[in-house]
Amino acid sequence: MISVFDMFKVGIGPSSSHTVGPMKAGKQFIDDLIKRNQFEQTTEIHVDVYGSLSMTGRGHSTDIAIIMGLAGYLPHNVDIDMISGFIEKVKQTALLPINVGQKIVKFDFENNLIFHRTFLKLHENGMTITALDENRTELYRQTYYSIGGGFIVDEAHFGKEEKNTVQVPYPYKNAEDILKHCSDNGLMLSTVMLENEIALNGKEAVSAHLENVWKTMQACIEHGIHTEGILPGPLRVPRRAASLYRALQANTNLSNDPMRVIDWVNMFALAVNEENAAGGRVVTAPTNGACGIIPAVLAYYEKFISPLTPEIIERYLLAAGMIGSLYKMNASISGAEVGCQGEVGVACSMAAAGLAEILGGNPLQVCIAAEIAMEHNLGLTCDPVGGQVQVPCIERNAIASVKAINASRMALRRTTNPRVTLDKVIETMYETGKDMNAKYRETSQGGLAVKIVCN
C-alpha cells in the first residue's frame, strides 16, 4: 500500500523527480557501498544522467542534488544554506567528501558527472553511478530511476511490486475497492485510510507526520508571502506572492469584490511554488512541481470556511493521500512519464477530494470531486521553460488550486450520477500520457519551452 508517508515527504525544491529523487539515489549508492564493504576502497565516483533527468537536469539542480546525496545528505534534513558553498568547494578542488565527510574521493564536476541526451529503456528519468578504486577499476555500479514524487527504484527492482509485510484492514487497488469498504463498513474515505495507516505506522506516528506536513506547508506559505526578489536562473522571474499579499492586506473587504477569494488562493499557491523554485523547504504533494495546490486549498478552507483542527487537517491529508495513492499505483505522478497531468493534474485531484471530505462529502462525492478535477487536466503538457520549475509551473499551481475548489463544489452540489468514474479517468490519464510526444514530457524540447527565449 502507498502510504501518506510516501505521498507527503518533506524535501527541498525545485523538483521531486529531478532533485529529491536524485539526492536520495546518491545517498542510497553510498549506503550500498558501505553494506558491500566497498566504501573504503572507493577513491573516485562517476555519474551518468539520462533522458528527461538529463535534458532538464541543470535547471532542476539535478547535478547538485546527486552530489549532496553522495555527500551523505537527504532532502528532509539537509541544511539548505550550506549547499551552495559546499558545491563551490567541490568544483574548485575536484574532491567530494562522501558520507558526511567520512571519506574524500576524486570528483571533477565537469568530467565525473555527464548529462546524456539518450534515454534508458525502463524509464524517462535514469542515472547510473559507478564507484572506482585507486586503479580506476570498477568496484560497484548501480542504475537508479527517479519515478516521480521523490520515489526511486534501482534497476533490479524496477516494475516489481513492493509487498507490505503488515496486513492492512482495508486493502485496495482502485477507487471501486475503496468505495466498497466505505459502503460495507459505514466509513468515511479518510477513516479507511487512517485505519490502514495505523496498521502500518501506529496512530501516534501518523498524527505526528501529518502535523509536520501541515506545519511545513504553513511555514512555506509564510516565508513565501514575506520574501521578494528574483528567482534563480536565466529567466529572472520575479516573485509575486509578497506584493499580492500586501495588496490583499490593504483591502480585506470581500463585499466589494467576492472574487478576491480567488486572489487569496492564488497567493497561497504562488507563495509555496516560489519557495520551491528557490530551492526552499517544501512538501511533495505529490510532487514538488505541484506542491502549492494541496496547501493552498487547505489554507483557503482555514481562511474562508472554518478554523482548522488537528482532526480536519488529518482528514484532508488522508483523503488527498488516498486519492494520490491510486494515481501512483495505477498510473504515474511523473511529468517525464505522463506530462503535467501526472503532477498538477494529480495534485488538483487530491486537493479536490480532500476539500470535499472536510466539507462533509460522502465517499462517492469525494471520488467524484477527484474525478472532475483530473478530467479537466487531461492532456496537460510538461514544457518547463529553461528546464526550470518556474514558467509555466508556478502560475499553473495557482490555476489548479482554484480548479480543485470548483471541482469539489461541483461534486457536492451534483444531483445526478456521473458517467465517468475516478478509475476510468485515472486509466485515461495514463494512456494519454503515454501517447504524448516526448517533447511535451519534461524534456524542454517542445511547447512553451522552445517559444520563450532565456537570456
Swiss-Prot record:
Task: Report the superkingdom from the record.
Answer: Bacteria
**Pfam families assigned:** SDH_alpha (PF03313), SDH_beta (PF03315)
Fetch the InterPro entries from UniProt: ASB_dom_sf, Fe-S_L-Ser, Fe-S_L-Ser_mono, Ser_deHydtase-like_asu, Ser_deHydtase_bsu
Keywords associated with the record: 4Fe-4S, Gluconeogenesis, Iron, Iron-sulfur, Lyase, Metal-binding
A GO biological process held by the record: gluconeogenesis
Q: Which reaction does it catalyse?
A: L-serine = pyruvate + NH4(+)
Cofactor(s) for this UniProt protein? [4Fe-4S] cluster
Cofactor: binding comment = Binds 1 [4Fe-4S] cluster.
Which is one GO molecular function term here?
A: metal ion binding
Question: Which pathway?
Answer: Carbohydrate biosynthesis; gluconeogenesis
In the UniProt record, does the keyword Metal-binding occur? Answer: yes
Q: What is its EC number?
A: 4.3.1.17
Family in the record? Belongs to the iron-sulfur dependent L-serine dehydratase family.
What name does this protein carry? L-serine dehydratase
User: What species is given as this protein's source?
Assistant: Haemophilus influenzae (strain ATCC 51907 / DSM 11121 / KW20 / Rd)
List the taxonomic lineage. Bacteria, Pseudomonadati, Pseudomonadota, Gammaproteobacteria, Pasteurellales
